[in-house]
Swiss-Prot record:
A GO CC annotation given for this chain: membrane
UniProt-listed Enzyme Commission number(s): 2.7.7.23, 2.3.1.157
Intrachain disulfide bonds: none
Gene responsible for this protein: glmU
Name of the molecule in the record: Bifunctional protein GlmU
Length: 462
């Protein structure tokens, strides 16, 4: 088996992005562009991956960690100069090396493997990945001779009129014989319009030495898209979204309107789940089978088990167990855990709380920093009062408890099993098992008081 290495070019400043964020760290469907590239490269099982970093180097290293080795390009002197920075890490290795830009998030491992195979079949020292561009402006052109052999690559600013009319472009991905690559790089000069050391000049150097230079034309130009500004970022995101959504539908998920459904890379969805329009699924989210996610819902970094109904609600870093349901217009905040067959109705919020099986929280309630047992009824307008202005406090509620509407549960407090909280109560003390707690002022009726009220003199109120 041929030894494979990879060099990822990630040193560009990305000035056209007009951003404080390092270009290759801009996200496409939830992951930085350079992560997409590295993930696909890793699928080809390279022996060594070297990422060339420059501006914002530490942020790239922090994100990718030990998945790659790194070489610093302190000055931006061109792609040839960038690749040369990996020399100390790779120059003595046999085999082949792929060079790919860190801002091409749509490239796939399948394309890389086809490039490797073509390179091997042609016995080439260098193979260029090319594509036919509808509009080649801005790309380096592939110049072939009369019998179709690659002669050179000409950068946009160095083209003449005839060369500029060529629509076969250089995608910026190459496969080289590793040792040949670094030998040739030392012969590259910066005698061009940009005053830079072009990696593309290696092609001409090898041709002059009589080496075989091949070009594999990929069938899908869209896959080669490089991202240099926010417009291209949105275009790449659109393509990636379509890939992701298509994969889920082929795996048995119903997307009512794929065009309006945003699902990030890494989200897992079981079969026979239905996703309505304008749903957003992000981060490390898993959704089971036979679920329903209603229009306008957002789920982030959460686990949704089987047979769950979510109606127009937001769920963040939470867990919903089998058979539960939520919404419309409710919010599970971080560390909320909803038990089996639990009902969380409309306009409710649950935060840092565990809700036991079969408990019902019907509407207009807040449950924060609490543990609730099983088979509880939480009435309308119940508030778990968890913050004293300085610190958060926890409330524990047992099982088989009835909490009447408009009650306040002031933590820290313990409410035992089989208890009843009367409507309108403000509970500040522990409630023992099988007790009923009433904590409100006694009602007073004042006879004939109506006549003393100002409205009594208004004819409309007579």
């Amino acid at each position: 088996m041929v030894n494979k290495n990879a060099i990822i070019l990630a040193a560009g400043k990305g000035t056209r992005m007009k951003s404080k964020l390092y270009k290759v760290l801009h996200e496409v469907c939830g992951r930085p562009m350079v992560d997409h590239v590295l993930t696909e490269v890793e699928k080809t099982e390279p022996a060594t991956v070297v990422t060339i970093v420059g501006h914002g180097a530490e942020k790239v290293k922090d994100y990718l960690g030990d998945r790659s080795q790194y070489a610093l390009q302190a000055e931006q002197l061109g792609t040839g100069h960038a690749v040369l920075q990996a020399e100390d890490l790779l120059k003595d290795q046999d085999g082949i090396t792929i060079v790919v830009s860190g801002d091409t998030p749509l490239l796939t491992a399948g394309t890389f493997e086809k490039l490797f195979a073509y390179h091997h079949d042609k016995g080439a020292k260098a193979t260029i990945l090319t594509a036919t561009a509808p509009d080649p402006t801005g790309y380096g052109r592939i110049i072939r001779n009369d019998i179709g052999i690659v002669e050179k690559i000409v950068e946009q600013k160095d083209t003449n009129d005839k060369e500029a009319a060529v629509n076969e472009i250089n995608t910026g991905v190459y496969c080289f014989d590793n040792k040949t690559l670094f030998q040739a790089l030392h012969e590259v000069t910066n005698e061009n319009a940009q005053g830079e050391y072009y990696l593309t000049d290696v092609v001409e150097i090898l041709k002059k030495k009589g080496e075989i230079v091949a070009a594999y034309k990929m069938p899908n130009f869209e896959e080669s898209m490089g991202v240099n500004d926010r417009v291209a970022l949105s275009q790449a995101t659109k393509v990636m979204r379509q890939r992701i959504n298509t994969a889920h539908m082929r795996n048995g998920v119903t997307l009512i309107d794929p065009e309006s459904t945003y699902i990030e890379v890494g989200v897992k969805i079981g079969n026979d789940t239905i996703i309505e329009p304008n749903v957003v699924l992000k981060g490390n989210t898993t959704i089971g089978s036979d679920c329903f996610v209603g229009a306008g819902s957002t789920i982030i970094d959460s686990t949704i088990e089987d047979n769950i109904q979510i109606t127009s609600s937001t769920i963040e870093s939470a867990i919903m167990h089998t058979g539960s349901n939520i919404g419309p217009n409710s919010h599970l905040r971080p560390n909320a855990e909803i038990g089996v067959d639990v009902h969380v109705g409309n306009f409710c919020e649950v935060k840092n709380a565990k809700i036991g099986d079969r408990t019902k929280i019907g509407h207009l309630s807040y449950v924060g920093d609490a543990t609730l047992g099983t088979d509880i009824n939480v009435g309308c307008g119940v508030v778990f009062v968890n913050y004293d202005g300085v610190a958060k406090h926890h409330a524990n509620v047992g099982s088989h408890v009835f909490i009447g509407s408009n009650s306040n549960i002031v933590a820290p407090v313990e409410i035992a099993d089989h208890t009843f909280i009367a409507a309108g109560s403000t509970i500040t003390d522990d409630v023992p098992e099988k007790a009923m707690a009433i904590a409100r002022a006694r009602q007073t009726n004042k006879e004939n008081y109506w006549a003393k009220l100002p409205v009594a003199k208004d004819e409309e109120w007579q």
